[in-house]
């Protein structure tokens, strides 16, 4: 597991300071134990619940030891709050505080503009799309095609909306085609996100190769109880994953 605790100003300064300390203590514990199955990030909620003062405290407590996990531009309220109260968009604000980097994960990134995508790209920051959660909350669709085209490391998550990653895969594909009004886009992008990029994201935190079957790699294997109704081969396995299988 790679874990963190969500820092927020929502419950007052005392709780916020406790959350910051919880992250710092857990990072220290992981550094001491060096358990290859356990890693730490520094968690934050969303920018509209985190003040500049709190960001400074988070960065000081982290001291460059690990990356950050934070919800970004999930809804337009995050963008409006950032512009109104801080005079800049969310991604710029994160960059100004030193939050971005190649071990930081930005959740959602639905309402990011071109300039923000460039910052994400140039800082090698990771993004994780949560298609079902975003649709369920009616807050928009992540610009997956544009992010993928820029070479941004883009993974797939759930935001705790489901525990079925193949369900998320289906929804990710359908949402991108619906959003772009094109019936032939998204296939390569969403399969890359789940089967390749998620492993690359994991490798940022665990000292073993993931997502491949080869000597020395992690035993990153699941067995599916699946009876295909049409021919099944290595040439059409993605189609069976999307249209035939479930994760349950």
Residue positions per predicted region:
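Short acidic/histidine-rich active-site segments
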Residues: 68-75, 128, 137-140, 145-171, ...
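Metal-coordinating catalytic core of metallo-dependent amide/deamination hydrolases
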Residues: 1-110
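Glycine-enriched alpha-helix->loop->beta-strand junction motifs that scaffold or abut catalytic
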Residues: 62-67, 99-102, 119-128, 149-154, ...
């Amino acid at each position: 597991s790679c874990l963190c605790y969500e820092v927020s100003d929502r419950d007052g300064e005392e709780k916020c300071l406790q959350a910051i300390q919880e992250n710092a203590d857990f990072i220290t514990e992981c550094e001491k134990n060096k358990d290859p199955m356990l890693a730490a990030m520094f968690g934050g909620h969303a920018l509209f619940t985190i003040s500049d003062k709190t960001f400074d405290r988070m960065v000081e407590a982290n001291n460059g030891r690990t990356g950050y996990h934070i919800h970004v531009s999930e809804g337009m309220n995050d963008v409006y709050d950032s512009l109104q109260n801080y005079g800049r968009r969310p991604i710029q604000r994160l960059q100004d505080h030193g939050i971005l980097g190649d071990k930081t994960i930005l959740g959602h990134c639905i309402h990011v503009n071109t300039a923000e995508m460039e910052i994400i790209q140039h800082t090698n920051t990771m993004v994780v799309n949560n298609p079902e959660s975003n649709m369920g909350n009616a807050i928009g669709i992540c610009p997956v095609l544009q992010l993928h085209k820029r070479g941004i490391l883009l993974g797939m998550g759930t935001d705790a909306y489901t525990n079925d990653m193949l369900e998320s895969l289906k929804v990710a594909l359908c949402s991108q085609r619906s959003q772009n009004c094109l019936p032939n886009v998204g296939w390569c992008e969403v399969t890359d996100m789940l089967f390749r990029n998620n492993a690359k994201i994991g490798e940022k935190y665990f000292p073993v190769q993931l997502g491949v079957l080869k000597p020395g790699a992690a035993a990153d294997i699941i067995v599916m109880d699946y009876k295909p109704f049409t021919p099944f081969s290595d040439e059409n396995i993605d189609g069976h994953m999307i249209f035939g299988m479930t994760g349950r």
